């Protein structure tokens, strides 16, 4: 699955730098995301992600619960970049 460059927001980067447990969780959830495990998104969103992966088009989104709260991992529709962020940063 093409996901482009992976980046994180300042909020995620700051927490990763300060919290080793959170950093490990982010790394773990990135692995899940890149293997097609979308975390705690709705069944409809999971199905849409799976279709978009098969077709090679459309955006992708995963949601995961961490020790610092929920994070989102989102891939742009053109698959140029994948961003890790807190929902409040959207």
How should these model regions be labeled?
Residues 1-61:
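Compact soluble domain cores
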Residues 54-90:
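Short, compact, well-ordered microdomains
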């Amino acid at each position: 699955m093409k996901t482009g460059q992976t980046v994180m927001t300042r909020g995620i980067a700051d927490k990763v730098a300060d919290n080793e447990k959170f950093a490990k969780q982010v790394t773990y959830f990135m692995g899940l995301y890149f293997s097609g495990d979308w975390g705690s998104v709705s069944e409809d969103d999971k199905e849409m992600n799976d279709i978009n992966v098969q077709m090679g088009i459309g955006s992708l989104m995963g949601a995961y619960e961490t020790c610092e709260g929920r994070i989102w991992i989102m891939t742009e529709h053109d698959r140029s970049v994948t961003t890790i962020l807190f929902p409040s940063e959207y």
